[in-house]
């Protein structure tokens, strides 16, 4: 059904006393313009680049995603105070330029002389509680597209959440023909185009764009775990990965008439998220969650079960609740094994090819782990030396998150969708 509740959740502090962002990071985020709602800003923090490191301040593809979540989590607590005053207090050195939240600017001297707002961690806010958003549905949609995306990252201590739905009714109308227009394009390119479409105008609930986005997500995830491939497609479609296990996997929308999987009637869906920290370096997983955020901006997705999220994320209207859908986690490297096992059983991959891919996956994971842990150590050292200017460049993680997790069960749950 169409979305009626427009709540969003702010970031946790990861053990720090304040939002994990400082003036230097905030300035870097806003270097292209002072509005965090600009389409260019939104697509920028999705980060479509293939490189694992982009700059010292933005070392991974997931860094800008997390940092923008921190920036919005702090600055939006100014107008969402009970009195809704928007320009009398600053976050860091920033204030909103207008009550319509058009942009962020350096606070004037009188406000700079006053203490900054002390933002709170893990708060849920309702867009309709702020009068200027409640009165402008179109602007609220554009804002909520991004607030949905950061909520999908902030609900847990792991990676961003994606929604996967399989329903034959989604293929009605001209969706198949429109999907053919993306034949030969990468998942990243398709996601980029759909994000632009969502930002330009609200999607109708279960309209063509919303249905096509859900189909693209289902094709990606069914391909990601090896359920569909060139010998077992979903209505002739699947995503072909050119170098599975590589640091920069590219998934290309492909077609094959060899064999189509038998799809059961009905509507089946689940939520999935990477639990290992190397999601930070996987643009495809980030884009999948961003597309889910686009869906959330216009449609009310099923609730995520309270037992799948921490206490601070439970019973958020429109997001989590009792009796909701289970949130399935997986370890990125382990999912490569699930993918290879299925393709080998289906005769698409030889044992030698699997060994080669898994060896590449091991090398890639170790490289990513070394980088992420080095950056985390640098951030910890910086925060101890600068207690009044703390920050994290990537979302905090623990060593336990590198464990195998529930990957096999998650892979089976995705496979069971068809």
UniProtKB/Swiss-Prot annotation:
Q: Which UniProt keywords apply?
A: Capsid protein, Inner capsid protein, Virion
Where found? Answer: Virion
Alphabetized Gene3D superfamilies for the sequence: 1.10.287.1520
Q: Which InterPro entries does the UniProt record give?
A: Sigma_1_2_reovir
Q: Write out the GO cellular component annotations.
A: viral inner capsid
In Pfam terms, one family for this protein is: Sigma_1_2
What the protein does comes down to: Inner capsid (core) component.
State how it assembles.
Answer: Interacts with protein mu-NS; in viral inclusions.
Q: What is this protein called?
A: Inner capsid protein sigma-2
The species this protein belongs to is Reovirus type 2 (strain D5/Jones)
């Amino acid at each position: 059904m169409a979305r009626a509740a427009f709540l969003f959740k702010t970031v946790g502090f990861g053990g720090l006393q304040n939002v994990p962002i400082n003036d230097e990071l905030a300035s870097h985020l806003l270097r292209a313009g002072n509005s965090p709602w600009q389409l260019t800003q939104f697509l920028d923090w999705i980060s479509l680049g293939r490189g694992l490191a982009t700059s010292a301040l933005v070392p991974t593809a997931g860094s800008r995603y997390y940092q923008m979540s921190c920036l919005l989590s702090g600055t939006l607590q100014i107008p969402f105070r009970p009195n809704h005053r928007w320009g009398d207090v600053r976050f860091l050195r920033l204030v909103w330029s207008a009550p319509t939240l058009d942009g962020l600017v350096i606070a004037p001297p009188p406000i700079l002389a006053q203490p900054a707002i002390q933002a709170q961690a893990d708060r849920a806010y309702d867009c309709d509680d702020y009068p200027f958003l409640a009165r402008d549905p179109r602007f609220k949609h554009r804002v909520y597209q991004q607030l949905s995306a950061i909520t999908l990252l902030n609900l847990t201590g792991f990676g961003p959440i994606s929604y996967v739905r399989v329903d034959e009714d989604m293929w009605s109308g001209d969706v198949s023909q429109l999907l053919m227009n993306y034949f030969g394009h990468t998942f990243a390119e398709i996601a980029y185009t759909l994000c632009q479409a969502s930002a330009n105008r609200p999607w109708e609930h279960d309209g063509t764009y919303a249905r096509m986005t859900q189909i693209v997500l289902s094709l990606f995830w069914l391909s990601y775990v090896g359920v569909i491939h060139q010998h077992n497609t979903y209505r002739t479609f699947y995503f072909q990965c050119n170098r599975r296990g590589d640091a920069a996997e590219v998934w290309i929308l492909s077609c094959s008439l060899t064999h189509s999987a038998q799809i059961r009637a009905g509507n089946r869906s689940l939520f999935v998220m990477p639990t290992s920290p190397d999601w930070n370096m996987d643009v495809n997983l980030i884009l999948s969650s961003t597309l889910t955020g686009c869906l959330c901006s216009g449609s009310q997705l099923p609730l995520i079960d309270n037992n799948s999220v921490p206490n601070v994320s439970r019973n958020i209207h429109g997001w989590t609740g009792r009796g909701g859908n289970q949130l399935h986690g997986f370890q990125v490297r382990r999912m490569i094994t699930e993918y290879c096992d299925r393709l080998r059983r289906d005769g698409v991959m030889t044992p030698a090819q699997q060994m080669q891919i898994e060896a590449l996956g091991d090398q890639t994971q170790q490289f990513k782990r070394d980088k992420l842990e080095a950056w985390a150590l640098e951030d910890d050292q910086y925060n101890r030396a600068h207690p009044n200017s703390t920050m994290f460049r990537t979302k905090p993680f623990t060593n336990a998150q590198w464990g195998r997790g529930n990957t096999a069960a998650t892979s089976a749950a995705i496979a069971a969708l068809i």
